[in-house]
């Protein structure tokens, strides 16, 4: 096993010994780079061949259950030599690293191995709720303690810093950042944006599937009630949306992959799709 790991590491170094070309966001990195990516995110779907609910590793021939496999995306930016991978389970996680100094993705490892890409994720939600409850009780208790003891500011700040460190150390157990801190600033890449944001996304990416409710081949817009009903194959595509502070992005996933970045405060319509469907797309292909 040790020899195998050394070979994988050596192969990874060889891959990174020359300037790597740009790798767009993709679920399937080049075959020659599989040892590199599969060393650091070994549960990603592109590392495995699955048959009859049993998956065999393409690199090590190791076998695991299909329930432990998750969908992943990998990206590499050549100028900055930064590598990025996203683990898309019930609650997506993102990880950036230097391509020449990669790090295994340990923060979500337990979650992947135990819950995989399917199954019931209520235990994770319950764990988060319990943590928030304990954190709230601890915070209130801390305020009461400081008030009763009449502590000086210096001591108060030390205790607050200690509490913050404890919260930070608890993150690996929660498998994701505290959503209460990131909810407004960062929207993970997801197929279904929050309901409160549907009007925003469906205004500029109106052909995305999350904007429509379809039944018996007919689709009704979720946001604009006066929008005419359309047929289910009338240019509705799977979409992914993301938001980082003031930068928003949506991707359309179908025969031709498209990614569009925009300023969140100055969004642009998905105009390319109108021309594309007019000249290229056949409804039977969607």
Curated annotation (Swiss-Prot):
Domain of life, source organism: Viruses
Ranges that cross the membrane: 1-17, 128-148, 153-173
Keyword vocabulary terms for this entry: Glycoprotein, Host membrane, Membrane, Transmembrane, Transmembrane helix
Primary localisation category: host cell
Membrane topology: Multi-pass membrane protein
Cell compartment(s), UniProt: Host membrane
Residues carrying a glycan: 61, 238, 263
GO annotation, cellular component aspect: host cell membrane; membrane
Biological function: Plays a role in virus cell tropism, and may be required for efficient virus replication in macrophages.
Family statement: Belongs to the asfivirus MGF 110 family.
Protein name listed in UniProt: Protein MGF 360-3L
Species, as recorded: African swine fever virus (isolate Tick/Malawi/Lil 20-1/1983) (ASFV)
């Amino acid at each position: 096993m040790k020899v195998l790991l050394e070979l994988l590491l050596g192969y990874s170094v060889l891959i990174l010994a020359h300037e790597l070309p740009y790798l767009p966001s993709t679920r399937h990195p080049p075959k020659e780079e599989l040892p590199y990516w599969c060393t650091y995110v070994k549960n990603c779907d592109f590392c495995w061949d699955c048959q009859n609910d049993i998956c065999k590793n393409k690199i090590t021939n190791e076998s695991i259950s299909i329930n432990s496999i998750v969908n992943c995306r990998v990206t590499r930016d050549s100028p900055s030599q930064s590598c990025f991978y996203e683990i898309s389970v019930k609650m997506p996680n993102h990880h950036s690293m230097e391509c020449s100094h990669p790090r295994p993705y340990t923060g979500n490892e337990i979650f992947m191995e135990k819950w995989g890409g399917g199954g019931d994720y209520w235990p994770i939600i319950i764990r988060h709720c319990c943590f928030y409850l304990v954190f709230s009780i601890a915070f209130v208790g801390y305020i009461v303690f400081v008030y009763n003891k009449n502590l000086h500011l210096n001591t108060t700040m030390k205790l607050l810093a200690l509490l913050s460190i404890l919260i930070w150390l608890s993150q690996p157990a929660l498998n994701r950042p505290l959503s209460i801190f990131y909810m407004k600033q960062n929207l993970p890449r997801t197929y279904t944006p929050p309901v409160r944001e549907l009007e925003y996304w469906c205004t500029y990416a109106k052909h995305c599937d999350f904007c429509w409710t379809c039944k018996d081949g007919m689709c009704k817009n979720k946001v604009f009630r006066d929008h005419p009903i359309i047929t289910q194959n009338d240019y509705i595509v799977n979409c992914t949306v993301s938001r980082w502070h003031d930068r928003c992005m949506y991707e359309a996933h179908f025969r031709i992959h498209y990614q569009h970045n925009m300023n969140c405060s100055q969004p642009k319509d998905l105009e390319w799709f109108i021309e594309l469907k007019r000249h290229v797309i056949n409804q039977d292909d969607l």
